[in-house]
Amino acid sequence: GYIYIEGVKNMPVYLFSVDGKLLHFAENVNGSYSIPAENGVHLIKIGNTSYKIINF
């Protein structure tokens, strides 16, 4: 599946597994962005804000 992000304005985006492993990084994301990701629980950091998400 994918994780979709919208409304980001020139911010870094990090995707982590729940055990802290960096799965994806993108610099200066602007507008809409999608990240391929397996189903399950992930942590995503956009700029200085972190979110816990479930991808299914």
Predicted regions and their residues:
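C-terminal outer-membrane/trafficking sorting elements
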Residues: G1-F56
